[in-house]
Amino acid sequence: MIWHVQNENFILDSTRIFMKAFHLLLFHGSFIFPECILIFGLILLLMIDSTSDQKDRPWFYFISSTSLVMSITALLFRWKEEPIISFSGNFQTNNFNEIFQFLILLCSTLCIPLSVEYIECTEMAITEFLLFVLTATLGGMFLCGANDLITIFVAPECFSLCSYLLSGYTKRDVRSNEATTKYLLMGGASSSILVHGFSWLYGSSGGEIELQEIVNGLINTQMYNSPGISIALISITVGIGFKLSPAPFHQWTPDVYEGSPTPVVAFLSVTSKVAASASATRIFDIPFYFSSNEWHLLLEILAILSMILGNLIAITQTSMKRMLAYSSIGQIGYVIIGIIVGDSNDGYASMITYMLFYISMNLGTFARIVSFGLRTGTDNIRDYAGLYTKDPFLALSSALCLLSLGGLPPLAGFFGKLHLFWCGWQAGLYFLVSIGLLTSVVSIYYYLKIIKLLMTGRNQEITPHVRNYRRSPLRSNNSIEWSMTVCVIASTIPGISMNPILAIAQDTLF
């Protein structure tokens, strides 16, 4: 009898929850229509996986890619609409958030073709991989539009949990298991510190959780200059620092980059930074409006440490993925300059433009690593010597992406850095910009060193890996080359047409 009563209560509670969720989607679903498309794609993937066999693998890629492209299309159709706050203040839709959501969707769309051949060669479970990628993308999109402390915590946890699972996807690889363990432990620790900072904000504002209401609460309680706000600022900076991975919060980055499957690293290297940058700008700009001098100083220290340590340590690396890990630490230092400048002097517009270029440069380089690694099984920089003699397209595309990452004209990376540094200079960040210029010169050195190896034709320097190198006959090879071609074009052509891209970003934001 008791069991029947409990069972009926469970059914009633479940029905109420379902009806409430349906009610929210019915009246607020139009505000998260791009996210709803991804949710529908996830459900469709699960249904097809449970009713089909392994011969339907192409359908999994098709559904994932189509849902991402449709989500991008839905996002573009509502471009330039009036800002809307929905879900009882938990979610905000505006042009600023939508730009970051577009960048995250673009990352995921380009990463799926990179993964096709890798998944087939390593015989990884395809459905779960794509589910984790789409769910992480969904978490990143919700983080971009999060408008209260609870959503800002839950959304990145959704992204992080999928990231942990993806980084340890090759369970038989010892390095992958080690990377996942470090990633999980440090991620859990950083999340607890982030929540600790949120608790101080919540208490100091008189129990408010919405970002703008927190500012009003701090004014009402006269706590905006209290020690509690300083504790909250430091704790939240540490928590967000783990997601952005600037120095000194970068310890997990090289190990995770080296141990995780290469397509996963490509995905995490861009999406995590885009989502964390969107969250950082909103948190620092709104609740900490009265502490702008303090958080500017904290971010300046992080940017300087990142640019110096990231680029100097990258010189000493022998693994291509570890080198790119330290390079990404240096790159996030440049992005932080845009966060510090903010609305004034086009700081956000230049930051978003540079991140768009960084996505293409970084993913183009990782496409090369995926392709070369599948043919040779190595990640050592020395083993790339003489690749031009065997695969000119791969070597030339790699060289263009690396030169763009280094910031050499007339490539996209040069104009992106130039405008970012110019905005910082106009804002009075002279020391920070000077460090950025010097470390950019340092980065050119180790990028050129790799390009020299790629282009060498001396037989004594060519390794057995390149001598035995052969192109794969797999049809899916075209997907990697397609992604690489798109990324190479995006890393070169926008450099010539920088002004229109920047004008679009400025017009959209302001």
UniProtKB/Swiss-Prot annotation:
<keyword id="KW-0472">Membrane</keyword>
<dbReference type="GO" id="GO:0042773">
    <property type="term" value="P:ATP synthesis coupled electron transport"/>
</dbReference>
<feature type="transmembrane region" description="Helical">
    <location>
        <begin position="323"/>
        <end position="343"/>
    </location>
</feature>
<dbReference type="GO" id="GO:0048038">
    <property type="term" value="F:quinone binding"/>
</dbReference>
<dbReference type="InterPro" id="IPR001750">
    <property type="entry name" value="ND/Mrp_TM"/>
</dbReference>
<keyword id="KW-1278">Translocase</keyword>
<feature type="transmembrane region" description="Helical">
    <location>
        <begin position="124"/>
        <end position="144"/>
    </location>
</feature>
<feature type="transmembrane region" description="Helical">
    <location>
        <begin position="229"/>
        <end position="249"/>
    </location>
</feature>
<feature type="transmembrane region" description="Helical">
    <location>
        <begin position="347"/>
        <end position="367"/>
    </location>
</feature>
<keyword id="KW-0813">Transport</keyword>
<protein>
    <recommendedName>
        <fullName>NAD(P)H-quinone oxidoreductase subunit 2, chloroplastic</fullName>
        <ecNumber>7.1.1.-</ecNumber>
    </recommendedName>
</protein>
<feature type="transmembrane region" description="Helical">
    <location>
        <begin position="295"/>
        <end position="315"/>
    </location>
</feature>
<comment type="function">
    <text>NDH shuttles electrons from NAD(P)H:plastoquinone, via FMN and iron-sulfur (Fe-S) centers, to quinones in the photosynthetic chain and possibly in a chloroplast respiratory chain. The immediate electron acceptor for the enzyme in this species is believed to be plastoquinone. Couples the redox reaction to proton translocation, and thus conserves the redox energy in a proton gradient.</text>
</comment>
<dbReference type="InterPro" id="IPR010096">
    <property type="entry name" value="NADH-Q_OxRdtase_suN/2"/>
</dbReference>
<feature type="transmembrane region" description="Helical">
    <location>
        <begin position="24"/>
        <end position="44"/>
    </location>
</feature>
<keyword id="KW-0521">NADP</keyword>
<feature type="transmembrane region" description="Helical">
    <location>
        <begin position="395"/>
        <end position="415"/>
    </location>
</feature>
<keyword id="KW-0150">Chloroplast</keyword>
<keyword id="KW-0874">Quinone</keyword>
<keyword id="KW-1133">Transmembrane helix</keyword>
<feature type="transmembrane region" description="Helical">
    <location>
        <begin position="149"/>
        <end position="169"/>
    </location>
</feature>
<comment type="similarity">
    <text>Belongs to the complex I subunit 2 family.</text>
</comment>
<feature type="transmembrane region" description="Helical">
    <location>
        <begin position="99"/>
        <end position="119"/>
    </location>
</feature>
<dbReference type="Pfam" id="PF00361">
    <property type="entry name" value="Proton_antipo_M"/>
</dbReference>
<dbReference type="Pfam" id="PF19530">
    <property type="entry name" value="Ndh2_N"/>
</dbReference>
<keyword id="KW-0520">NAD</keyword>
<dbReference type="InterPro" id="IPR045693">
    <property type="entry name" value="Ndh2_N"/>
</dbReference>
<dbReference type="GO" id="GO:0019684">
    <property type="term" value="P:photosynthesis, light reaction"/>
</dbReference>
<keyword id="KW-0793">Thylakoid</keyword>
<feature type="transmembrane region" description="Helical">
    <location>
        <begin position="183"/>
        <end position="203"/>
    </location>
</feature>
<feature type="transmembrane region" description="Helical">
    <location>
        <begin position="418"/>
        <end position="438"/>
    </location>
</feature>
<keyword id="KW-0934">Plastid</keyword>
<dbReference type="GO" id="GO:0008137">
    <property type="term" value="F:NADH dehydrogenase (ubiquinone) activity"/>
</dbReference>
<dbReference type="GO" id="GO:0009535">
    <property type="term" value="C:chloroplast thylakoid membrane"/>
</dbReference>
<feature type="transmembrane region" description="Helical">
    <location>
        <begin position="59"/>
        <end position="79"/>
    </location>
</feature>
<keyword id="KW-0618">Plastoquinone</keyword>
<comment type="subunit">
    <text>NDH is composed of at least 16 different subunits, 5 of which are encoded in the nucleus.</text>
</comment>
<keyword id="KW-0812">Transmembrane</keyword>
